Amino acid sequence: MIGVIDYGMGNLYSVSKALERIDAPYFVSEHPDELKRADSYILPGVGAFRDAMEILTENGLKTFIQAAANEGKPLLGICLGMQLLFEESEEHGASEGLGLLKGKVVKLKDCDQAGNRLKVPHMGWNLLKVHRDSPLLPKAKEGFAYFVHSYYVSGIEEEALLASAEYGVCVPAVVGLGNVYGAQFHPEKSSTVGMLILERFKQFTQEQKVKK
């Protein structure tokens, strides 16, 4: 059973519909006591990093997510939810993240190294380069994913970078170590590759449950 974490800043409808399409058992909740019964978690997110962390802290979800991840339960952050997995962000001033992965969230540059102008936010389809096999994505599976973001993760550990996209810089697109994973793009809006990630997260959840 996948617990979709509701803290008022996630696109819950599209995530829920995507999970229904792959017949993944799930429920949506904002309460840590209810979320405890889940075998894994999806942390969606749209909006500002600082606002999200303030809400997660106030609702007791910050410590709950950290504890669940440390217990080994699979966790998938989507878009802002992926950024929240990291140590800190510079968006609207420095603010602390969940600290489950190493790296800092910084603003995308409005030009590439050759001086060509780039639109920020990065919005639309972009090609994924898959760097290594992972529970979420096989190395041979490359394709296009749908992005909407103005910030990206810098200083990520090499082994945590599973797939990237180019947008003036190398943008970490799929990240993960151990049981903690994230997608900067929206899997639920990203056609074949996106649905594959959700399907494999469903399988990963089942595999981890069996191990216990």
Curated annotation (Swiss-Prot):
Q: What is its EC number?
A: 4.3.2.10, 3.5.1.2
- The source's domain of life comes to Bacteria
Q: Which PANTHER family match?
A: IMIDAZOLE GLYCEROL PHOSPHATE SYNTHASE SUBUNIT HISH
Could you tell me the keywords of this UniProt record? Amino-acid biosynthesis, Cytoplasm, Glutamine amidotransferase, Histidine biosynthesis, Hydrolase, Lyase
Domain Glutamine amidotransferase type-1 residue range list = 1-211
CDD domains referenced in this protein's UniProt entry, alphabetically: GATase1_IGP_Synthase
Family annotation (SUPFAM superfamilies):
Class I glutamine amidotransferase-like
Instruction: List, alphabetically, the GO terms of the cellular component aspect.
Output: cytoplasm
- Just give the chief location class: cytoplasm
Name the catalysed reactions. Answer: 5-[(5-phospho-1-deoxy-D-ribulos-1-ylimino)methylamino]-1-(5-phospho-beta-D-ribosyl)imidazole-4-carboxamide + L-glutamine = D-erythro-1-(imidazol-4-yl)glycerol 3-phosphate + 5-amino-1-(5-phospho-beta-D-ribosyl)imidazole-4-carboxamide + L-glutamate + H(+); L-glutamine + H2O = L-glutamate + NH4(+)
Its biological function? IGPS catalyzes the conversion of PRFAR and glutamine to IGP, AICAR and glutamate. The HisH subunit catalyzes the hydrolysis of glutamine to glutamate and ammonia as part of the synthesis of IGP and AICAR. The resulting ammonia molecule is channeled to the active site of HisF.
Localization (cell): Cytoplasm
Which residues are in coiled coils? none
State one Pfam family annotation: GATase
Q: Which organism is it from?
A: Bacillus licheniformis (strain ATCC 14580 / DSM 13 / JCM 2505 / CCUG 7422 / NBRC 12200 / NCIMB 9375 / NCTC 10341 / NRRL NRS-1264 / Gibson 46)
Q: What is the lineage of its organism?
A: Bacteria, Bacillati, Bacillota, Bacilli, Bacillales
Residue ranges crossing the lipid bilayer per the database entry: none
**Hey, which pathway is this one from?**
Amino-acid biosynthesis; L-histidine biosynthesis; L-histidine from 5-phospho-alpha-D-ribose 1-diphosphate: step 5/9
Q: Subunit notes for this chain?
A: Heterodimer of HisH and HisF.
GO molecular function list: glutaminase activity; imidazoleglycerol-phosphate synthase activity; lyase activity
Q: Name one GO biological process term.
A: L-histidine biosynthetic process
Name listed for the protein in its UniProt record: Imidazole glycerol phosphate synthase subunit HisH
**InterPro entries assigned to the protein according to its UniProt record, in alphabetical order:** Class_I_gatase-like, GATASE, Imidazole-glycPsynth_HisH
Residues in the active site?
Answer: 79, 186, 188
